[in-house]
């Protein structure tokens, strides 16, 4: 971070499917609270609106595909690509011009991540960019949006001058971390600290629980963080020890980069709804399936937000001249939602369960390695089985009780036996901003090469420093 504390501490969640930004005004002192930045973006040709999230999609239109000025932004009238909501919508119609999952491509060891390979499988004559450049453009959009909203008349408030906490998956290797920092610097950000996403969730839980966290964890415990995001699932295991009379937290294990998350759940709900339409002789095309996925996501969120609802509507626009008249309507019942989500993604399984692996047949095509088994509980069981030795060495088998210490990600199970899946608010960037401020943003580094402090990871560095959260937090969070 910067040698001199900045006015704002900013958290950026550079997600697989959505990006977000939140900040804390350090001038507010103890009354400081994280604030989400509404992000201006193109939502229709020529229409810019503010949204709480920036979808991690980038659209590269073909020649004469859109009218002149369709992609202009308040700060750039000549923009020739789209990032965000319109990119996602238009990409559903022309997928060969849509860049998605850039974050997962950024950690793919089988490709040159600086090479222009995205959109994947696009024709040779199509516009392409690298996974690195896609990350640069997402971050650049956030920088431009911040400066437009927050720093029109104050150069010292520009995002380039603020202390930035930028998340990375715990499963990112050193190369992917270095590329993330390279992308941030290319977007103009210099005062960067990388923070692993599960650790961000853990810090946010500590801050939110105040001193109550001490009653939930003690020496000899293990804390399992299961971060189910929009496109990936990240698993981290933290052991609770003691050092000079204070609790010490050591990260002992990290899971694989599992391409499985909330988007998969929405897609599964869409396929279930499509079968209902098919039974009525209504067959949806690819674009309508994309619309159905968005509608199912909205219906799912309504059902989670209001437990009294038995169902929520889903709609898909018809095709042809009479679009409104041809609107396809249906509903997603709570029973069907629970059946799909719990049965498909959170089924009961034995402790030694293993996710089903797709059988390799002949030559395998290069691409993203999506999880072949959607059961997150099986991936979790396999992770814990692999870490049995580490658990045996560091965790004391006492008390015989298991305690959830927090929730997060896309969905959590309310009950282990057939209960409803409850929504868990994923605070994302807001957690980062709050956690960073709670730690004082405090032990700072100067310039690109400084050491990492405050329990965060310097780009690719294998060491971590002391953490000093407010209200007597853990003394150390380090890697084993």
PLM features: residue spans?
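Acidic low-complexity intrinsically disordered segments
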Residues: 190, 318-390, 464-480
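Conserved phosphate-binding catalytic cores of ATP/NTP-utilizing and phosphoryl-transfer enzymes
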Residues: 1-7, 194-226, 388, 394-399, ...
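Gly/Thr-rich phosphate-binding beta-strand-loop-beta motif of the actin/hexokinase/Hsp70
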Residues: 2-32, 102, 210-251, 296, ...
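Glycine-rich phosphate-binding loops at beta-strand->alpha-helix junctions
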Residues: 164-179, 291, 317-322, 329-330, ...
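Conserved phosphate-binding/catalytic loops in two-lobed NTP-binding clefts
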Residues: 187-200, 369, 425-452
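Phosphate/ATP-binding catalytic cores across multiple sugar-kinase/actin-like superfamilies
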Residues: 137-156, 204-216, 344-405, 424, ...
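Phosphate-binding loop and its immediate beta->loop->alpha context
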Residues: 34-186, 196, 267-312, 317, ...
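Acidic, glycine/GT-rich loop-and beta-edge segments that sit at the periphery of enzyme/chaperone cores
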Residues: 3-6, 14-16, 37, 217-220, ...
């Amino acid at each position: 971070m910067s040698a001199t504390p900045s006015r704002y501490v900013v958290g950026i969640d550079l997600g697989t499917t959505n990006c977000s930004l939140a900040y804390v005004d350090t001038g507010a002192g103890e009354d400081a609270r994280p604030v989400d930045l509404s992000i201006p973006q193109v939502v229709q040709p020529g229409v810019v609106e503010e949204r709480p999230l920036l979808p991690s999609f980038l659209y590269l239109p073909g020649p004469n595909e859109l009218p002149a000025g369709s992609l202009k932004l308040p700060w750039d009238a000549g923009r020739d690509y789209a990032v965000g909501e319109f990119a996602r919508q238009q990409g559903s119609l022309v997928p060969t011009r849509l860049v998605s999952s850039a974050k997962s491509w950024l950690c793919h060891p089988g490709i040159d991540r600086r090479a222009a390979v995205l959109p994947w499988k696009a024709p040779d004559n199509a516009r392409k960019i690298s996974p690195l450049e896609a990350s640069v453009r997402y971050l650049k959009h956030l920088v431009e949006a911040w400066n437009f909203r927050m720093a029109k008349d104050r150069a010292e408030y520009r995002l380039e001058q603020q202390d930035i906490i930028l998340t990375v998956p715990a499963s990112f290797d050193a190369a992917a971390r270095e590329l993330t920092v390279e992308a941030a610097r290319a977007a103009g950000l210099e005062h960067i600290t990388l923070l692993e996403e599960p650790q961000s969730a853990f810090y946010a839980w500590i801050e939110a629980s105040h001193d109550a966290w001490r009653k939930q964890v003690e020496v000899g415990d293990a804390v399992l963080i299961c971060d189910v995001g929009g496109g990936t699932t990240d698993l981290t295991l933290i052991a609770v020890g003691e050092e000079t009379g204070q609790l010490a937290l050591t990260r002992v294990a990290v899971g694989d980069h599992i391409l499985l998350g909330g988007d998969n759940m929405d897609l599964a709900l869409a396929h279930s709804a499509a079968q209902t339409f098919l039974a009525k002789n209504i067959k949806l095309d690819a674009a309508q399936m994309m619309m159905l996925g968005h509608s199912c996501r909205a219906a799912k969120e309504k059902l989670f937000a209001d437990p009294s609802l038995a169902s929520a509507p889903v709609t898909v626009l018809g095709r042809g001249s009479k679009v409104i008249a041809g609107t396809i309507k249906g509903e997603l019942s709570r029973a069907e939602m629970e059946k799909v989500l719990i049965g498909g993604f959170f089924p009961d399984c034995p402790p030694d369960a293993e996710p089903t692996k797709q059988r390799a047949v002949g030559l395998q095509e290069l691409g993203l390695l999506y999880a072949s088994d959607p059961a997150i509980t099986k991936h979790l069981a396999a992770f814990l089985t692999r870490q049995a030795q580490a658990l045996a060495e560091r965790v004391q088998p006492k008390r015989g009780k298991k305690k959830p210490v927090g929730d997060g990600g896309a969905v959590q199970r309310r009950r282990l036996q057939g209960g409803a899946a409850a929504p868990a608010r994923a605070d994302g960037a807001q957690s980062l901003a709050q956690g960073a401020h709670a730690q004082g943003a405090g032990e700072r580094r100067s310039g690109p090469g400084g050491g990492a402090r405050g329990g965060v990871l310097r780009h690719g560095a294998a060491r971590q420093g002391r953490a000093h959260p407010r209200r007597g937090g853990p003394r150390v969070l380090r890697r084993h």
